[in-house]
Amino acid sequence: MGTLPVMVLFGLSFPPAFFALLAALPLFWLLRRLLQPSGLYDMIWHPALFNCALYGCLFYLVSWLFI
């Protein structure tokens, strides 16, 4: 992550990881919308914890691929 510069927008500086977080968000929403009707959430013990882990995995994937 150290190769990309810090972006400054309207006087606010954003690290490159911020844009990876934003890129992972639509992927998370899409994947969650696909998984909910499949019945997978009925078998999951803690759906909020699963969602957090899913978003973390998607963030890692996006940051690994694009940063």
From Swiss-Prot:
It is found in: Cell membrane. Keywords: Cell membrane, Membrane, Transmembrane, Transmembrane helix. Its main location: membrane. It is a multi-pass membrane protein. One of its GO terms (cellular component) is plasma membrane. It comes from the Bacteria. Signal peptide: none annotated. NCBIfam families: PRK11594.1. HAMAP family: AaeX. Belongs to the AaeX family. This is Protein AaeX. It comes from Edwardsiella piscicida. The lineage of its organism: Bacteria, Pseudomonadati, Pseudomonadota, Gammaproteobacteria, Enterobacterales.
